[in-house]
């Protein structure tokens, strides 16, 4: 099993880093390519991540032709043939986000059989909102032997109110509605930038989607969609991770192509902590002086609130700010597992239900730790940068799902970090 080894204590990050296309955007975009019954769809600025390879397999398994040019960061999908109805367990079980193929398959074929999803084990992440919305559009759903089977002679528009602004459910319903009869209105819809990016692609394919980025999205169904060329939006979570890395090491880093508007909640909290954040033509610059960092209170919320996908990394930043900080996690259950690993490094923290209290400014020591999920893996590596001595982070399968060349980018900024492959250790 690969490991990342960090020599901590003196890792002030300086320089510039370029951000990849967004993982959370490209996966539903790949699912959307199934909707194009005419022409090829080309996605540009595609990140090279294990989740992308899995989604390519899912789409390819539906009888679409998928060509991934890694050097060009480009995926071409030809879904003009007969799309099959079943997304098999061997692919879908590896990644939770693959459930978003359910809506597109239904829209194209009228019958879908999709394995229950896998991925990060972060609390209870039910898919009932996906299913309730599809039922409102005339879909009959049954769950048997680990599969969701959905049938509809013809999807019809519906007025759907979501109890929670689920990103995945919003994406699934948007895609299903593009080829439905009539108008679909989704209220309390997710408002993330990745939702907007999906709407842009769908409209480029000939769909009629309005209101993406607001709490009410309206989709007027059309007869068919066609291929197009689309550039994947930049990854705001990767950008945020490097903002935090610069802040917690007292660094000076330009995050190229980062979008201020997409990172506004994070930037607000960085400024509150005493971090200098500057919008420049090429991206966002982050500077900090460790002695100026102040403890803060943060609560995760659906967008435009503070993103849950930045919670773990921000708790790492809290470890170097003197005083007691608090982090309240309202989006997912069981998302403080990384703090248990940080305690092995000397972190003083307490978890009471959905709230973590973190005592910052205390010396941390390097240790051997294990990643528990995607964002936790990044948080543990960042903590290793500021801990004294050597930190070894294992279970990198999580890291590779969402960060491309993470250790290399940190090393280019001055971090003492290397990745040791399993074969290297065996020699």
Swiss-Prot record:
The active site is at residue 120. The keyword Iron does not apply. The keyword Membrane does not apply. Keywords: Cell cycle, Cell division, Cell shape, Cell wall biogenesis/degradation, Cytoplasm, Peptidoglycan synthesis, Pyruvate, Transferase. Pathway: Cell wall biogenesis; peptidoglycan biosynthesis. It is found in: Cytoplasm. One of its GO terms (molecular function) is UDP-N-acetylglucosamine 1-carboxyvinyltransferase activity. Its EC number is 2.5.1.7. It is an enzyme of class 2 (transferase). It holds the Pfam family EPSP_synthase. One of its GO terms (biological process) is cell division. The modification 2-(S-cysteinyl)pyruvic acid O-phosphothioketal is found at residue 120. Its main location: cytoplasm. Phosphoenolpyruvate binds at residues 23-24. It catalyses: phosphoenolpyruvate + UDP-N-acetyl-alpha-D-glucosamine = UDP-N-acetyl-3-O-(1-carboxyvinyl)-alpha-D-glucosamine + phosphate. UDP-N-acetyl-alpha-D-glucosamine binds at residues 96, 125-129, 309, 331. InterPro entries: Enolpyruvate_Tfrase_dom (IPR001986), Enolpyruvate_Tfrase_sf (IPR036968), MurA_subfamily (IPR050068), RNA3'P_cycl/enolpyr_Trfase_a/b (IPR013792), UDP_GlcNAc_COvinyl_MurA (IPR005750). GO terms for cellular component: cytoplasm. Belongs to the EPSP synthase family. MurA subfamily. Cell wall formation. Adds enolpyruvyl to UDP-N-acetylglucosamine. This is UDP-N-acetylglucosamine 1-carboxyvinyltransferase 1. It comes from Streptococcus pneumoniae serotype 4 (strain ATCC BAA-334 / TIGR4).
């Amino acid at each position: 099993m690969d490991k990342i080894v960090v020599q901590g204590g003196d890792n002030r990050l300086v320089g510039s880093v370029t951000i990849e296309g967004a993982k959370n955007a490209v996966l539903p975009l790949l699912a959307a390519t199934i909707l194009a019954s005419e022409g090829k769809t080309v996605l540009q600025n595609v990140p090279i991540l294990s989740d992308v390879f899995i989604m390519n397999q899912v789409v390819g398994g539906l009888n679409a032709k998928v060509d991934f040019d890694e050097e060009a960061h480009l995926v071409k999908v030809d879904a003009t043939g007969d799309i099959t109805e079943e997304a098999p367990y061997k692919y879908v079980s590896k990644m939770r986000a693959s459930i978003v193929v359910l809506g597109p398959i239904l829209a194209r074929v009228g019958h879908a059989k999709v394995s229950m999803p896998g991925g990060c084990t972060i609390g209870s992440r039910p898919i009932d909102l996906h299913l309730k919305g599809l039922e409102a559009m005339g879909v009959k759903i049954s769950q048997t032997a680990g599969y969701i089977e959905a049938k509809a002679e013809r999807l019809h528009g519906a007025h759907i109110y979501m109890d929670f602004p689920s990103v995945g459910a919003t994406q699934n319903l948007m895609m299903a509605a593009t080829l439905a009869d009539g108008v679909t209105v989704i209220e309390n819809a997710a408002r993330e930038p990745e939702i907007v990016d999906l709407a842009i692609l769908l409209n480029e394919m000939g769909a009629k989607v309005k209101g993406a980025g607001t709490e009410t999205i309206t989709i007027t169904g059309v007869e068919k969609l066609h291929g197009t060329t689309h550039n994947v939006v930049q990854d705001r979570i990767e950008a945020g991770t490097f903002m935090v890395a610069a802040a917690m090491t007292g660094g000076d880093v330009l995050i190229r192509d980062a979008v201020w508007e997409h990172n506004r909640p994070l930037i607000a909290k960085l400024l509150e902590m005493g971090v200098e954040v500057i919008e420049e033509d090429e991206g966002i610059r982050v500077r900090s002086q460790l002695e100026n960092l102040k403890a803060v209170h943060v609560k995760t919320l659906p967008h435009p609130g503070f993103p849950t996908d930045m919670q773990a990394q921000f708790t790492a930043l809290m470890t170097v700010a003197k005083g007691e900080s608090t982090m309240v996690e309202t989006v997912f259950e069981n998302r403080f597992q990384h703090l248990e690993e940080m305690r092995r490094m000397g972190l003083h923290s307490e978890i009471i239900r959905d709230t973590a209290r973190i005592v910052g400014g205390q010396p941390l020591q390097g240790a051997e730790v294990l990643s528990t999920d995607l964002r936790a893996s990044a948080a543990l590596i960042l903590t290793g940068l500021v801990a004294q001595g050597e930190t070894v982070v294992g279970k990198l399968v999580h890291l590779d799902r969402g960060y491309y060349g993470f250790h290399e980018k940190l090393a280019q900024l001055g971090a003492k970090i290397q990745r040791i492959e399993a074969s290297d250790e065996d020699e």
